[in-house]
Amino acid sequence: MFCVPSTETGAIMNITKGGLVLFSANSNSSCMELSKRIAERLGVEMGKVQVYQEPNRETRVQIQESVRGKDVFIIQTVSKDVNTTIMELLIMVYACKTSCAKSIIGVIPYFPYSKQCKMRKRGSIVSKLLASMMCKAGLTHLITMDLHQKEIQGFFNIPVDNLRASPFLLQYIQEEIPDYRNAVIVAKSPASAKRAQSFAERLRLGIAVIHGEAQDAESDMVDGRHSPPTAKNVAAIHRSLEIPMLIPKEKPPITVVGDVGGRIAIIVDDIIDDVDSFLAAAETLKERGAYKIFVMATHGLLSSDAPRLIEESAIDEVVVTNTIPHEIQKLQCPKIKTVDISMILSEAIRRIHNGESMSYLFRNIGLDD
């Protein structure tokens, strides 16, 4: 099982406080809860900064204490207005850079635009663009959690620590699901099978994979550079020179590979945003005989009508971490539960500031985790 720092809740960590400044880059007060938890664990005060919107909707950041020669940690959690969130971060990073901070470490538990990390049709790899902007602004190190694709780390030319929330979710399963030994870990599509396998192997449980219409359709659009030529061009091409094209994909009827009858089904994924695929998976699992259904994910974006749809669905409980604030969604849907991951973020900050190795936080993590 993954290793988690043994710091007890509320305990103050052993940290060299001199030369450390902790900022929250959020102008939205509801997004500052995670920052406060981290500061409390580290036993430090939040740095003095003012982040607000001008009447013309421009973002303004005013650093209200000296950061010269200090390690500055900027915590930024993503709000509904993701573009404002990004501008707040970039402006604060640049302000610290021009104020001669020794190092500027971004603590971004959920990396925005991480779903746009592949070329689709005539679009762009937006997460690469965002990584370049952060580095150009002055970021010297990034702490994040469960990137949507691990390859995003390669978009940066600075150190990136991609922490894992799995230890906390595994602990929740063991402590909060009394009969979890009768559970099966479910991947709602073949794309998430590796993550499900990682959970199943650590809990010594079986695995099931849902395949068919419920799987994500975005995999069909990975690269659109195969666009067919125009009709005029086709007429000009000799038949013998036509380039063979891939046969279009046709999804089979939805099916479950693995036995879930009379079991608890635990669906695992990294992000839960649009919940349609999770609802379809839950209905399928119910039809196959699962008597209880849990959904576990690191990042709970829970956009649009997600809380209402979850409340009305066959899902019994949705468990997410607090990488993204979702207090309003919890009020709308009591099925949503939160796991606090401030402990591991605090430990990462402490180790980086004290110049200690980060390898402890990655023990027992394999290439597929």
Swiss-Prot record:
UniProt-listed GO biological process terms: 5-phosphoribose 1-diphosphate biosynthetic process; purine nucleotide biosynthetic process
Gene3D superfamilies: 3.40.50.2020
Lineage: superkingdom: Eukaryota
Keyword Iron-sulfur attached: no
Key word Electron transport present: no
GO molecular function: enzyme regulator activity; magnesium ion binding
Keywords: Nucleotide biosynthesis
CC terms in the record's Gene Ontology section: cytoplasm
InterPro entries assigned to the protein according to its UniProt record, in alphabetical order: Pribosyltran_N, PRTase-like, Rib-P_diPkinase
Annotated PANTHER family: PHOSPHORIBOSYL PYROPHOSPHATE SYNTHASE-ASSOCIATED PROTEIN 2, RIBOSE-PHOSPHATE DIPHOSPHOKINASE FAMILY MEMBER
Chain's role: Seems to play a negative regulatory role in 5-phosphoribose 1-diphosphate synthesis.
Family (UniProt): Belongs to the ribose-phosphate pyrophosphokinase family.
Name of the featured protein: Phosphoribosyl pyrophosphate synthase-associated protein 2
Organism: Gallus gallus (Chicken)
Taxonomic placement: Eukaryota, Metazoa, Chordata, Craniata, Vertebrata
Gene name tied to this protein: PRPSAP2
